[in-house]
């Protein structure tokens, strides 16, 4: 690392940080997508039961009775909110990926310019 210019060292550090941020965003997106699938599965289950059926909902470690229309509305709102979060994360991910690629290209260009020319081999 000692023969790499400080500017390139800083760019490498930024690249590593950006890579970690990309991994974090991807993990969050995966969690939200799983929550969406789970909520949609619950919505499908609720379609098959009568409007006046007893429904129980987990609230932390407690199960509470809830009216079906209220829970259906709650699930719809939850899915909508999660979908918005996923879209936001996708935008962030796309911007970060573009920045990552640009930074990678800049670093490669800087390192290629710094390399001494390879002498021709004698045959």
What are these regions (language model features)?
Residues 11, 15-32, 36-39, 46, ...:
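Amphipathic alpha-helical coiled-coil segments
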Residues 1-13, 120-123:
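N-terminal or membrane-proximal amphipathic helix/coiled-coil initiation segments that transition from
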């Amino acid at each position: 690392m000692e023969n790499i210019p400080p500017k390139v060292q800083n760019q490498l550090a930024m690249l590593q940080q950006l890579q970690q941020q990309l991994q974090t965003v991807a993990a969050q997106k995966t969690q939200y997508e799983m929550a969406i699938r789970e909520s949609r599965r619950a919505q499908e289950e609720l379609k098959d039961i009568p409007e006046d059926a007893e429904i129980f909902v987990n609230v932390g470690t407690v199960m509470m009775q809830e009216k079906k229309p209220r829970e259906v509305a709650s699930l719809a709102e939850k899915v909508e909110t999660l979908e918005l979060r996923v879209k936001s994360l996708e935008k962030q991910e796309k911007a970060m990926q573009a920045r990552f690629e640009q930074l990678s290209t800049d670093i490669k260009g800087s390192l290629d310019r710094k390399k001494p020319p390879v002498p021709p081999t004698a045959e």
